[in-house]
Amino acid sequence: MRNAIIATVLLLTACATAHHAESPGAVARMWHGRVPDARAAEYEDYLRREGITKLEAIPGNLGVDLFTRSRDGVTEFIVISYWHSLDDIKAYAGADIEKTHNLPRDPEFLIELEPNVRHFTVKMSNRK
């Protein structure tokens, strides 16, 4: 399953909008979480309000994409945030940029807490 998630992330990162990562060398930070379908709408609202809105206000952030899919009673969430540089991510996340920064209520919603996020260098972004 992890390989399928990685493949999905690479595809989604490649499809990121141009205004999020205009300059070569921008960094995409990907987080993945899974929530029971019955709580997905509530979690999405919480994630947008308490996570995404706050990410967008952090200096160095270029934007955020949210992807979801429901399958077999579970909704997967992928959040890809775009940053000018790894230094901007370090200013937000601290020295260990691979460590997930969970929201306070994530344990209430998420099936499991993933310990790490992933980072990708944005090479191209050309969605119309």
PLM features: residue spans?
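Short, solvent-exposed loop/turn elements at domain surfaces
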Residues: 39-42, 55-56, 90, 126-128
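Enrichment for repetitive, rod-forming helical segments
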Residues: 9-10, 36, 125
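Bacterial N-terminal signal peptides
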Residues: 6-14
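An amphipathic, aromatic/His-enriched active-site/gating alpha helix that lines ligand/cofactor pockets
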Residues: 21-22, 49-62, 82-119
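Glycine-rich beta-strand-turn "strand-cap" elements at beta-sheet edges
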Residues: 15-28, 65-73, 101-128
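Positively charged n-region of N-terminal signal peptides that target proteins for export
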Residues: 1-4
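Short, well-ordered beta-strand segments in beta-rich or mixed alpha/beta enzyme
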Residues: 26-34, 63-95
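N-terminal targeting signals for Sec/Tat export/insertion, comprising classic cleavable signal peptides
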Residues: 27-53
